[in-house]
Structures are given as structure tokens and as C-alpha cells.
């Protein structure tokens, strides 16, 4: 299920993005400040380049690039 980013409370969205950008394997040795990484993800969401996907089985949200989202979720 796709969740519109603007349907989330601002603080909830920020925590989701921060969780994503601080996960193991996402920094790749990048020394970019957390605020900058959060801003980049927020911009990708507003441009429709990234989407929030909710998995009802695991009851978890994840951020995905639009081209990586399973096609059936767009139906």
C-alpha cells in the first residue's frame, strides 16, 4: 500500500526519513550531515521520485525509489 507523504504528521515523516538515512548500508562512508540527507529524501518524496510503502503483513513502512516499487501497488 502506498502512503502519501503529506498524509503523515510532520514529526512522523521526519522520523521515518531519519530512520531510513541512518540505517546500516545507507551512508556508504558519506559524511553528508543528517539534515542534508533528510532534506534530499524529503525533496525526492515531494517530487514523486521516492514513495512510502506500507507492508500490512509486517506493519512496517519503508521508503523506496519509485522505479523500485512493485507495479501492482500503483493499481
UniProtKB/Swiss-Prot annotation:
Signal peptide, first to last residue: none
InterPro entries linked: UPF0270, YehU-like_sf
SUPFAM superfamilies: YehU-like (SSF118001)
Pfam families given in the database record: UPF0270
UniProt-listed Gene3D superfamilies: YehU-like
Domain of life: Bacteria
Family of the protein in this entry: Belongs to the UPF0270 family.
Official protein name in the record: UPF0270 protein Pfl01_4103
UniProt lineage: Bacteria, Pseudomonadati, Pseudomonadota, Gammaproteobacteria, Pseudomonadales
